[in-house]
């Protein structure tokens, strides 16, 4: 087997309420994914708060480095949500802004990075990251499953049609799900995709086009573009999720969670867990308990 000589990195979008979870993710990457770089994009107002995580292979960056100068974040919430305003777009929800940051990372990270793996703050890596499990015969993994249960699937497909002017046949999109932790984006593919999106915008800006798209999914957009436009250039398809999804509210104690994690990690396909919080209320298991549950893997 040839040695891997490409440069890859992990990318995380985070903010202040997820600081402790992101800190635990960093700890797990230190143990299992060194020496790969890890870029952490945070809201501008949280940049100073996250400086403790700017060490070693971890690089904290402001999300505004990706956003165009003409986007303005409202300092207060409307209808319970933060919005970004610009003279060229509809009001943009913060979760759409985070997607824009994922798509635009290659504009601001180091030029030697060929591919990135997007990983959520709420993930914990519990097994060594072996790139050979995600890179085969010169191609990176592209997660795709036919077990499509995404509630917003129809919206995601309509967004793709809008971005690419119906260039992809409907039946090639309807049955597939591209969402998983981790999702890999290749620089060459991403730059090609954003260039194509820009073509249909009056200002030749993929960011304006994307911001004016209703309910997009960055993973659906990238996956469908690579599969149907680029014909799997730089990618191969795999339907195994690297991180097992667990609902935080299903666990009350660290012991209960530890038993589940131990069972999950008996499966060789998983390299970690994704413990997602729901409404971030008192019923959710704390990061401290999650860390205690993972102690035997991380020590």
Where are these regions (language model features)?
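N-proximal low-complexity "stem/linker" segments adjacent to membrane-targeting elements
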Residues: 1-27
């Amino acid at each position: 087997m040839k040695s891997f000589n490409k440069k890859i990195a992990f990318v995380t979008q985070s903010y202040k309420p997820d600081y402790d979870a992101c800190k635990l993710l960093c700890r797990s990457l230190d143990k299992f994914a060194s020496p790969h770089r890890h870029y952490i994009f945070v809201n501008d107002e949280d940049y100073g708060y996250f400086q403790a995580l700017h060490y070693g292979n971890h690089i904290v960056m402001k999300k505004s480095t990706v956003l165009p100068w003409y986007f303005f974040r409202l300092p207060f919430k409307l209808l319970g949500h933060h919005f970004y305003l610009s003279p060229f777009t509809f009001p943009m929800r913060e979760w759409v802004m985070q997607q824009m940051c994922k798509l635009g990372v290659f504009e601001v990270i180091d030029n030697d990075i060929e591919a990135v793996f997007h990983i959520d703050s709420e993930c914990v890596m519990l097994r060594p990251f072996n790139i050979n499990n995600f890179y085969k015969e010169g191609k990176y993994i592209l997660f795709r499953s036919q077990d499509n249960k995404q509630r917003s699937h129809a919206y995601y497909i309509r967004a793709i049609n809008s971005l690419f002017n119906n260039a992809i046949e409907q039946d090639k999109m309807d049955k597939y799900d591209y969402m998983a932790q981790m999702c890999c984006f290749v620089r060459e593919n991403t730059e090609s995709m954003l260039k194509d999106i820009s073509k249909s915008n009056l200002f030749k800006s993929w960011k304006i086009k994307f911001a004016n798209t209703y309910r997009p999914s960055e993973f659906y957009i990238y996956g469908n573009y690579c599969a149907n436009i680029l014909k799997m250039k730089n990618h191969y398809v795999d339907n195994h999720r690297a991180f097992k999804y667990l609902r935080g509210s299903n666990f009350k104690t660290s012991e209960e969670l530890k038993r589940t994690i131990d069972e999950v990690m008996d499966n060789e396909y998983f390299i970690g867990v994704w413990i997602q919080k729901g409404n971030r209320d008192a019923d959710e298991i704390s990061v401290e308990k999650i860390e205690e549950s993972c102690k035997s893997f991380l020590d």
